[in-house]
């Protein structure tokens, strides 16, 4: 995912800024969240370090899932394992009736060799695409799991006072092949069905910031493959064949006009990128075909459909104009991660209570996330948690980098944020502060 630049760096002292809850009952619950989050912080840090040192690729999160399940069971939470592969679902039923809230954390790591000098740095390896690779939590999922384990501890301590039910979703394979859909197909949203779902993601902006936006926050990501077919001939006689390389070059340029000239970028951004072109094996032979592979990113279902149609039209027409044929294949990936506008407005005061002015409405991100599938089922809110040391912005390396670093001071903020979202939603917190 590309880096998002936040607003000005906040002093850590600002983390104590709070907004008064809506009632005395809300105030008491908020105080309990903060107190238990502080008491649990050292344990959350220990979990995070353990998970970071023992990363596992998608659908191989056996150790992580076992750690999660054992912890949830120790809290007296109902636990189901093997959901959608290696997923874990926990259900905590509060002492008072109320809504059902789902909280989600993804568990998988990446095929990346860690370059961060930490005493708990990963030295793990695994087989990936037929070769041995290093494995690292280069996207912060170790933080996500530890935070949600901490939230489970906090809310379990508050069980008797909780006005509703909390469903904990520990999801496999967000980085691929995808774990949200298999979990849903395996009944993760059944018995009971959530009324809302919340999640967070570690992001390279300063600790003390939480970024969010109503509507499309992360893009849909679709695969693009175009095969341009021509007629092979000798390079000295191009007129006796059909050159697919020339056609492919024009298609690359033409695809950029889809975004720059045919889509209203002031309404909803879009990106079309060709990242791979293969064709021919000799410098003096015009090949019979060229293969182009790329990615399509859009931020609304309407633009997604429109961009797909325009890509097919542009590629086919340009190829035809040069006597070639273009076969276009679009593989649907994760849909848009869209925050429910009403839910976002309702819960914004909860975020401000945790980080004050550090709760920032952000610009969209053209990366993708399969939290989107959960948010298609019920209203959802996905937030970006700042994990870069405010005093050293140079540590803010992009997600998926072998240098990705997460400041552990963000963990307690993450626990407070997710727990507050759950408690405040169940309490029926009003829209205004």
Regions found by a protein language model. Name each.
Residues 1-5:
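N-terminal secretory signal peptides that target proteins for export/translocation
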Residues 8-20:
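Bacterial N-terminal signal peptides
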Residues 51, 90, 103, 141, ...:
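Divalent metal-coordination and catalytic microenvironments
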Residues 124-136, 142-143, 155-287, 394:
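Histidine/acidic-residue-rich, glycine-tolerant segments that coordinate divalent metal ions
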Residues 38-42, 55-66, 142-146, 239-246, ...:
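Soluble non-cytosolic domains of exported or imported proteins
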Residues 92, 228-230, 296:
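Hydrophobic beta-strand positions in extracellular immunoglobulin-like domains
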Residues 25-28, 74, 249-433:
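Metal-dependent amide/peptide-bond hydrolase catalytic core
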Residues 26-136, 143-163:
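Acidic/His- and Gly-rich active-site-bordering loop/insert found
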